[in-house]
């Protein structure tokens, strides 16, 4: 199989599909295999699914550096005056070695420049509205070993900066440009420039720039959406390639190899995060990365994988039955998660409070588990009020996607977590909610209890539009502000899941352990798409089969 991956990379030209609101996340059928004169099959990537249009995929688009930096400047305090300064990343080496990891540019720096090579810096004069990218000069003696960096002219043609200069002069420029009372805005104290002869006292501001950049990055520009769209096109095709071969695979690592090889063949050399290929019990581990266990019949396998395109991430998850059919139990659990995802995606539009989608997913999960008899001895409202569903759906519904797979979310956050103290018999005595960071974290039962209690108390309808939710948005909580509303231009994931139950006596009353035993060995289920918020709704950027009939058709084309 690895030989096939290395040898064949034929590309069929076909534009990727886009999914608008009220359309399901459909799939492309596998392309018919190519044949030669003797009717023997000629292996190529088109056997595994239709690749993205190569001309569209590799189209050169000038990086909108000036647009990005002016967005950032608008988020700084109104009195801001001086120079924004960011150094780029440098090459790194492993300890006691002349080798090192692949270069990875600092994401905030890349957002302002589009420069993806080491040794650079950027300055932006707030008063003059002047953006300069500073690049390293390549010593001719090093070209033999490492090649050359782009020239001044080549860089200027690729990114919309006002000027490109060699980095050796950056400190002299800053010293000459500073005026009395001006500041240098940096992300961290250790990134401040080392100035030899500044004019008077230099004010270094380390507090204003980071929130300004992170807020600017939340709503994507057209360029950023184009790159995320391309990352999704390649990753979607790679998922279809892996799905089409799954019934012939014997180990998780083979699934990983097909996905990674396909992405590389299309020009996406970097994964946005380590590929997760986990079967059976490992399918319930959110960040599983061993990818080395056998694929056993009558289990699920989760493939959570997405490549980068021009530093922009994709994040796609699918769950498939091994070897290629759903048992009754597998179909029931998969349908529950699919319904959670489908209904949450359909609710996406500007103005919706994202955390309300998580709460809706929890309600759907409870309805489905009650239907299957896994939950019992209570109503949907009683089970949700206690937070029991967090044992089955233990992680957040999603996150922003951009230059990071778990991208920044600005001054507000998508979801809430909690620090709680439990009263008698595990009851919630108090819960102190805080805004969670963008990375995926556990959503505790106490958190759900607080969210549900607030919704009931304040009259929210669970759709992010109700009176209670509006009141919560306006009332800036002492714990850290309002819950984030979706805006046009955001790209977020929707990834509900069904996993294990945390065995706590406080929740045992609602759990039918005998019924649950039928589902333990299957493993977890997660389904995840990348969703662009549009003016009136959403667009699903991901094109991978998720409906049961579509999945089986690709796995069993005959």
Swiss-Prot record:
PANTHER family, per database record: XAA-PRO AMINOPEPTIDASE 3, XAA-PRO AMINOPEPTIDASE AN0832-RELATED
Reactions that this protein is recorded to catalyse: Release of any N-terminal amino acid, including proline, that is linked to proline, even from a dipeptide or tripeptide
Region ranges (Disordered): 1-46
Cofactor: Mn(2+)
GO biological process, one term: proteolysis
Family: Belongs to the peptidase M24B family.
SUPFAM superfamilies tied to this protein: Creatinase/aminopeptidase, Creatinase/prolidase N-terminal domain
Composition skew (Low complexity), residue ranges: 23-33
Cofactor note: Binds 2 manganese ions per subunit.
EC number(s) from the headed UniProt entry: 3.4.11.9
Keywords, comma-separated and alphabetical: Aminopeptidase, Hydrolase, Manganese, Metal-binding, Metalloprotease, Protease
Bias (Polar residues) ranges: 34-46
Biased composition (Basic and acidic residues): 1-15
Binding site for Mn(2+) 1: 315, 495, 528
UniProt-recorded name of the protein: Probable Xaa-Pro aminopeptidase PODANS_7_5850
Function text: Catalyzes the removal of a penultimate prolyl residue from the N-termini of peptides.
Residue sites binding Mn(2+) 2 per the record: 304, 315, 528
Pfam families: AMP_N, Peptidase_M24
GO molecular function: manganese ion binding; metalloaminopeptidase activity
InterPro entries in the record: Aminopep_P_N, Creatin/AminoP/Spt16_N, Creatinase/aminopeptidase-like, Pept_M24, Peptidase_M24B_aminopep-P_CS, X-Pro_dipept-like
